[in-house]
Structures are given as C-alpha cells and as structure tokens.
Amino acid sequence: MRVWLISFLLVALGWAAQSDLEMARDRQDRAALEKLAEQAAAAEQKADNDAAAHYRAAVAYSYLAEVAQEQRDKGAVKRAAEPGIRSAERAVALKPDVAEYRRILGTLYGQIVPVNVLIGLSYGKKSQDSIAKAIELDPKSSEAYVSRGVGNYYVPSGLGGGVDLAIRDFQKAIELNPKSDEAYLWLGLAMRKSNRNAEARKAFSKSLELNPNRVWTKQQLEKTPAN
C-alpha cells in the first residue's frame, strides 16, 4: 500500500508539473518556464536512469523554446532546445519504444533548425525520422501528427514538406483528438499560409474555445484578416 501511494503521488506531481508548464506556456511566461526547466533539469541529474525524469526536462525545455520562438528570440530558442535535445536523447536511449519520447525529441530537433543553419539539414532529417518513428510506435498519437505537421509547415514542398501536407497532418490530429487546441492553432496557421483566412479564423476561434488562455492563439486570430 505504501509503495502504491508513493507511486500515485509521483504521478500526481508529474501531472501538476505538466499543468504548470502548460499554463506558463499559454501566457508566454518565460521566467516561469525557465524556473520550471531548471527544476526539471535538477531532478533529472539526480535520476540519470529515469527516462520519465529526462522526458519531463525535455518537455520543459521544448515549451521554453516554443515561447522564445513565438517571441522571435532565436538565441533563447537555441539555449532552450540544446539541453532539451540532450534530455530527450537520454530518455529515448533508456526507453526507445516509447512513442512520446521520440516525438518530443523530434520536436526539439525541429525547434533548433531555424536558428542554426550549420546543423539545420542534419537536425531536420533527425526531426523527421524521430517523429516518423513516434507515429510508427503509436499511430493514434494526435500530438505526433501535430509535430509532423509543424515540420511540414516549415519545410518547403520542394524538400518534401509543404503547407498542404501540414494541413492534412493537423486534420488527422484533430480526427484523433477533437479537443486538441494545439492542432486547431496550427491548422489556423497553415490555412492562413494558404490564404484561406476565413478557415484560419475559424480554426483559431475553435482553438481558443478549447483553450482560452493561449496568448499566441489570440495574437494569431487578431492578425488574421476576415477574408
């Protein structure tokens, strides 16, 4: 009973930390994200063989990089993504068959591509491979399809990506999880990139309906013309 209680408390603490991360990400609170990332990094250093601890650190760094990217701070993206990659690589090394660990690794690889041209091509391929493996391991992962869609959004069609592929990925993510505000957010961005502004606004509005606290979604809706 005592072991069960300890396990339950550890899981609950993990959920609480994830919730704190999401709230800080939603309000673009980089100071809070930096603190949470530091705490997660300290925890993983004390548990080198705990894949979940490394994963939690990777997620924290990825959220920090995400907000830095939203605010166009390339230096901060690099500073967050690099340690995040190390954490995610360690999680994958310990448990290579966990799809979510592969997904967050692929996401972090993708986040660093725009800020480091020298390694961009190499990391871009690593990102694609890692996310493809995540989908292979868990074909019903909505998050993995969002991650693949983000990659396709940024990669030109001539290099195997493109906005049309991205839209299909985001639509698949929504099919798998109709309550994914992240999928609707990125669907809106892809629709706007395709000059389909009315559909973009509809997707942004749905994303905000699901998650009213996401500052970046509000910003994207405000800057999208009605037609």
Indicate where each model-derived feature is located:
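N-terminal leader/linker segments that initiate helical-solenoid repeat arrays
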Residues: 10, 14-71
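Structural signature of tandem alpha-helical TPR/SEL1-like repeats
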Residues: 30-35, 71-86, 118-133, 159-172, ...
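Helix-start (N-cap) detector for alpha-helical repeat units in TPR-like alpha-solenoids
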Residues: 51, 99-100, 142-143, 181-182, ...
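Glycine-centered coil turns and helix-coil junctions that link the paired helices
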Residues: 64-71, 112-119, 148, 152-159
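Terminal, low-structured helical/coil segments at or just beyond the last alpha-helical repeat
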Residues: 164, 181-227
